[in-house]
């Protein structure tokens, strides 16, 4: 690098002064709607409006009873109870949705923590984007999102996507004033926060941070995208609409039935009907019908889904999965194929030079020991290797910890710099002493990079250095004097690749003043092949087990890598994907893959396990071919060129150290890059779906029981079996409380033993439907039988039922109605545990990690007891105290719901 391009950057004191003067690099979020307004918005919900109308009707009835019938002030307890229930349900819903919104704000926080490479006090280091200050010197490269506004100091073939600010998709940036675009919105040497580097690399000096940037003036907070309608969300919308219509029909049926039964008492002789009493009865009927509709409509379903997503997103973040688009949570659970990169995902991405083979005029260096010796001498050959590695690179080392320097930038290039450093070669000094004339950045299509410099180690020489895939670099070389044949080099490469090593080839040529980099290629007629390095990148310890989990879960795993077939095959063997039974049909190279017709690809795609020497568009085509086979595809990517594949997949998985372009195109960011985290995301996705099924199972079972009981009560002509406030309490249990309890259930590793579900299969499957109808029908039959007994016999306590004598129809007493209400609640209380264990074949009492369920169930039980036994509360719910023996009978009897399920589970597990 030219000496005038050696930058020191800011000192620690200058950083502190700049931050104090210009502020931090964080954008102030736009003002949000005040909480009180958000709360009032809840009262615009149609169901809340219906409840408010019911409350007003209840007030009207109470006024009639108080004034017209001269009853006591206790008649107002029911309307008060209705309004308390409305505010309680609305308040809880508002609170938990607010908490969920806080979870969704995590995206902005993570964006501000993105790593940025800067030069400070002469050292290259990484800091969080929020810590960038005015005056900082920042390195930007392909795929980076520019962290602040700044002015370019050095730029190499830099193109920036400014479409987010100016609408220009590609702007060429340069420091050469002669090449400035006079028509550009901003000067060609100025780069802006939030825009993205699409090609090249550069150094910039920050001129504005935070709200002072151009982006800050038009800032809108990053949002987690919930706009995509998945098959599940469409199903839930349809289910909610269907249940709502059915509930309204039942509500109308209740109104008609109650009016008919009332008029039947007078043989439909309207002259004998007390008008005021009839109006009061009509109002009471309307109130019951509207409340029944409110209870039946699954308004808790959206909250259950929201809570499940929020809980899943928070816990997934702890397992290194940052959800960027909410639909991905659910879709990951239906994934049937995962297309994964190799480097960093299956391997540790901790690269080191393990072997080297250099060729010096017939004198071969075939070991790392020999290569180390070459670095220590001062021959031209040694200088070509040292200088070529140092200057033909975009990586740097961070010496913040001198004992263990870390790599900034490309890990493969970083391994070479670490090798130089370990042998006492100061790569920074070499960069500072040379003058860079031309550069050709690396691309996945080209598979090599080149740099032209005026040499410092060989004064007076202008050198072209090339580095890249060995077979590509070797083919570029014209001079083969003293160099082994292509076959010999290929044989050496194969030995390295069979040990899962990544190989790089090096070449150089002394040139004159002519331009050798033209239109993205090098034009050199005497390029000389220097040799090869073999870089080891060990497999992550946890990956073989995670691959096994995915295969056991019925998920196909495919490796898509730029490495050679031998390297990829060996990695596949180490992680348990490639076996002795696999053949050439299971592995294909990028060029061979590109040559396939769509028909040929469709016939082969499910058999392919590895694509070697793959290019980014190969990955996209693979995704599309799998989708044609009705597969649900998740794909990983970390580079800008991976964006098309990430967008095409059902779930795009970007890597934590990937480019900003890749992250923006993805649905989930794997923060630690590990395949194990991908496996965890699948487990969370499946568990999320299962939790929603559990909530639906519980809610619809309660719906069936409540609707049929109230309708049957109306047809029987009895007093309403459940009062409005009682139904609202039941609604609170099955909607809000059940959503809280079942949405927060921890994921079960057992879901990884199941095959992937059909993504378009209806969420209510046959076992669920059978249980909803069966259990709901049983509860309904039990309660109707009790209601019939209560209507035709005087029950003082439950033990009277065994010796009851059915007589004439009579009024159901408050004690009997309290028994009915409490039995309803307690049977469903115990059924909540059954719903938690649905489809697991595990005990319903296995509550490890279910803190939310334990808390909610305890709250329901204690509240029900207080509601029935506390005199100050009884009046709101039209209940009376129960005898201790009746409590014991109800609890023990209702618990049979649980024990029958436990017996069934025990018998099933013995099969």
What are these regions (language model features)?
Residues 759-777, 807-819:
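Membrane-water interface at loop-to-transmembrane-helix junctions
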Residues 630, 682, 686, 781-793, ...:
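Alpha-helix capping/termination and helix-coil
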Residues 702-706, 774-783:
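Core segments of transmembrane alpha-helices
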Residues 734, 815-832:
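Generic alpha-helical transmembrane segments
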Residues 1-756, 761-764, 821, 838-911:
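Conserved cytosolic headpiece of P-type ATPases
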Residues 470, 474, 773, 777-778:
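Glycine-rich phosphate-binding loop plus the immediately following alpha-helix
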Residues 778-793, 864-875:
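Alpha-helical transmembrane segments and their membrane-interface junctions
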Residues 714-723, 789-815:
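Helix-coil boundary and interhelical linker segments in multi-pass alpha-helical membrane proteins
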């Amino acid at each position: 690098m030219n000496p005038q391009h050696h930058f020191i950057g800011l000192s620690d004191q200058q950083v502190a002064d700049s931050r104090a003067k210009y502020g931090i690099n964080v954008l102030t979020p736009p003002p949000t709607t005040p909480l009180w307004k958000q709360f009032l918005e809840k009262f615009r919900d149609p169901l809340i409006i219906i409840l408010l109308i019911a409350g007003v009707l209840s007030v009207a009835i109470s006024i009639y009873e108080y004034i017209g019938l001269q009853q006591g002030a206790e008649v107002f307890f029911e309307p008060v109870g209705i309004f308390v229930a409305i505010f309680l349900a609305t308040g809880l819903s508002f609170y938990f949705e607010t908490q969920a919104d806080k979870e969704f704000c995590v995206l902005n926080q993570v964006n501000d923590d993105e790593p940025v490479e800067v030069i400070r006090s002469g050292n290259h280091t990484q800091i969080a984007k929020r810590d960038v200050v005015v005056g900082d010197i920042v390195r930007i490269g392909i795929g980076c999102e520019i962290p602040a506004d700044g002015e370019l100091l050095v730029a190499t073939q830099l193109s920036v996507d400014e479409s987010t600010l100016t609408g220009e998709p590609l702007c060429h940036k340069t420091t050469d004033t002669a090449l400035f675009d006079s028509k550009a919105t901003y000067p060609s040497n100025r780069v802006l926060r939030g825009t993205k580097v699409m090609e090249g690399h550069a150094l910039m000096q920050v001129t504005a941070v935070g709200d002072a940037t151009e982006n800050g003036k038009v800032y809108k907070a990053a949002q987690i995208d919930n706009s995509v309608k998945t098959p599940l969300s469409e199903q839930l919308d349809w289910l909610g609409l269907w249940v709502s219509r059915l509930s309204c029909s039942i509500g109308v049926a209740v109104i008609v039935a109650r009016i008919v039964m009332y008029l039947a008492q007078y043989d439909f002789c309207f002259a004998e009907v007390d008008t005021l009493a009839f109006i009061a009865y009509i109002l009471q009927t309307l109130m019951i019908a509207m409340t029944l509709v409110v209870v039946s409509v699954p308004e808790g379903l959206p909250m259950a889904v929201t809570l499940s997503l929020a809980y899943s997103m928070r816990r997934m973040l702890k397992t290194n999965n940052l959800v960027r688009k909410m639909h991905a949570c659910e879709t990951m659970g239906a994934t049937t194929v995962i297309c994964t990169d190799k480097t960093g995902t299956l391997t540790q991405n901790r690269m080191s030079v393990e072997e080297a083979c250099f060729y010096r005029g017939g004198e071969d260096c075939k070991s790392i020991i020999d290569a180390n010796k070459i670095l220590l001498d001062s021959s031209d050959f040694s200088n070509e290797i040292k200088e070529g590695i140092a200057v033909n690179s975009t990586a740097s080392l961070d010496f913040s910890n001198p004992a263990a320097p870390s790599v900034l930038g490309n890990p493969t290039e970083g391994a070479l710099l670490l090798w130089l450093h370990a042998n006492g070669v100061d790569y920074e000094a070499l960069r500072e002493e040379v003058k860079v004339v031309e550069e050709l950045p690396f691309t996945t299509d080209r598979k090599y990079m080149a740099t032209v410099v005026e040499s410092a180690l060989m004064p007076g020489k202008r050198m072209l250095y090339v580095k890249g895939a060995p077979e590509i670099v070797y083919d570029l070389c014209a001079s083969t004097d003293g160099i082994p044949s292509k076959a010999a080099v290929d044989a050496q490469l194969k030995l390295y690749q069979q040990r899962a090593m990544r190989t790089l080839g090096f070449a150089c040529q002394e040139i004159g003043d002519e331009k050798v980099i033209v239109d993205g290629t090098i034009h050199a007629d005497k390029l000389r092949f220097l040799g090869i390095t073999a870089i080891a990148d060990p497999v992550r310890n946890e990956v073989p087990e995670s691959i096994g989990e995915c295969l056991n879960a019925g998920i196909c795993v495919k490796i898509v890598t730029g490495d050679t077939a031998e390297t990829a095959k060996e990695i596949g063997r180490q992680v348990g994907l490639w076996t002795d039974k696999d053949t050439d049909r299971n592995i294909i190279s990028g060029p061979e893959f590109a040559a396939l017709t769509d028909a040929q690809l469709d016939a082969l795609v499910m058999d392919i396990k590895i694509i070697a020497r793959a290019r980014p568009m190969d990955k996209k085509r693979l995704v599309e071919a799998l989708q044609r086979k009705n597969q649900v595809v998740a794909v990983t990517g970390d580079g800008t060129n991976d964006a098309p594949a990430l967008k095409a997949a059902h779930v795009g998985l970007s890597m934590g150290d990937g480019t900003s372009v890749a992250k923006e195109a993805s649905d989930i960011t794997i923060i630690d890059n590990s395949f194990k985290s991908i496996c965890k995301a699948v487990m969370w996705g499946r568990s999320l779906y299962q939790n929603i099924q559990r909530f639906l199972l519980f809610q619809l079972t309660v719906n069936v029981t409540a609707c049929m009981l109230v309708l049957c009560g109306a047809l029987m002509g009895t007093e309403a079996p459940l009062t409005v406030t009682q139904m609202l309490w039941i609604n609170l249990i099955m909607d809000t409380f059940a959503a809280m309890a079942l949405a927060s259930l921890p994921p079960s590793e057992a879901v990884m033993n199941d095959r992937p579900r059909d993504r378009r299969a209806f969420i209510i499957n046959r076992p669920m439907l059978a249980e909803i109808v069966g259990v709901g029908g049983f509860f309904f039959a039990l309660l109707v039988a009790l209601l019939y007994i209560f209507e035709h016999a005087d029950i003082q306590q439950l033990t009277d039922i065994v010796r009851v004598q059915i007589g004439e129809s009579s009024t159901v007493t408050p004690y009997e109605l309290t028994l009915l209400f409490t039995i309803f609640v307690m049977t469903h209380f115990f059924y909540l545990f059954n719903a938690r264990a649905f489809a697991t074949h595990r005990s319903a009492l296995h509550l490890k990690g279910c803190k939310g369920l334990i808390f909610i169930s305890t709250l329901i039980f204690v509240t029900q007891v207080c509601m029935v036994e506390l005199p100050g509360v009884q009046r709101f719910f039209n209940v009376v105290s129960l005898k201790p023996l009746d409590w014991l009978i109800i609890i023990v009897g209702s618990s049979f719901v649980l024990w029958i399920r436990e017996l069934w589970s025990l018998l099933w597990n013995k099969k």
